[in-house]
Amino acid sequence: MDDDKLLSGDKADDEEASLEKSLRPQTLAQYIGQARVKHELGVYIEAARKREESLDHVLLYGPPGLGKTTLAMVIANEMQVNIRTTSGPAIEKPGDLVALLNELEPGDILFIDEIHRLPKIVEEMLYSAMEDFFVDIVVGQGPTAHPVHFPLPPFTLIGATTRAGMLSAPLRDRFGIVEHMAYYEVADLEDIVKRTADIFQTSIKPSGAHEIARRSRGTPRIANRLFKRIRDFAEVADQDAIDEAIVARSLTYLRVDDAGLDETDNKLLRTMLEYYDGGPVGLATIAANIGEETDTIAEVVEPYLLQIGFLKRTQRGRVVTIKGYQHLGFPYPENK
């Protein structure tokens, strides 16, 4: 490949990366949706800045794709401090955590995604770091082993999780600010889609933005992903603006139905109806039947089906509701 093509490709990649980065809001004012969460965080941030203190530790929990990582970045911008990001599985041993904490300046933010997946020994080390801003680690082995005391600057830990129930009580109780991220309203998702279209310099009609928003499962990440794919279909069709018709055609190709359910969602419901009479059936059994991990079903697939009332949990397992039956066109049994 010649140099011109290499340079051209690099430039295109840089432009695409820049566009992706620009999708992330920088301030609470730019952040669309989650009005209650934004208002509360705005109060806490303003109070901390007035007192010239670090913000209290923050726990953000809710389904994936709702903007927890983005909100952590926004908090750092609003506090005018640096942020270091990592994830629970990436911190395998206490030394990894100490290395991260050692790089923090006073007031900085450490963001840990999937914080429920921290190893127990690392989690326990966080207790003193969060409460008293120090950690003790044992250096050496055998007779020469001795504890070393590491004082830390005041900092803010922001933890994000899709499984708040998996956090231990001692860790959860050390977060002074706990915010639940809820699924987005269609109107807020419309605004997000329109903003994304503006950033990508793509014309979109109100009907097109509404249809994308309506089928995005209340999730901004899905709305943006669908927009980019529909933009591809519109481009190939030489369509000047994205309207409801091109959205509908594109989503048919993408196997996203009228309720916003994708192939996996419908496969789960159909499997439960065809093989288990709508349930109750256990999560592990469902996972084995549709070829998905139980964590994927519990964290990604199931929450929205519960939210829209197509599925419900019972002590004996998951059960498809009458709305779920109706969605797939199955008759609802009289003995249910």
Swiss-Prot record:
Its main location: cytoplasm. Its EC number is 3.6.4.-. Mg(2+) binds at T69. CDD domains: AAA. Has 3 domains, the large (RuvB-L) and small ATPase (RuvB-S) domains and the C-terminal head (RuvB-H) domain. The head domain binds DNA, while the ATPase domains jointly bind ATP, ADP or are empty depending on the state of the subunit in the translocation cycle. During a single DNA translocation step the structure of each domain remains the same, but their relative positions change. HAMAP family: DNA_HJ_migration_RuvB. This is Holliday junction branch migration complex subunit RuvB.
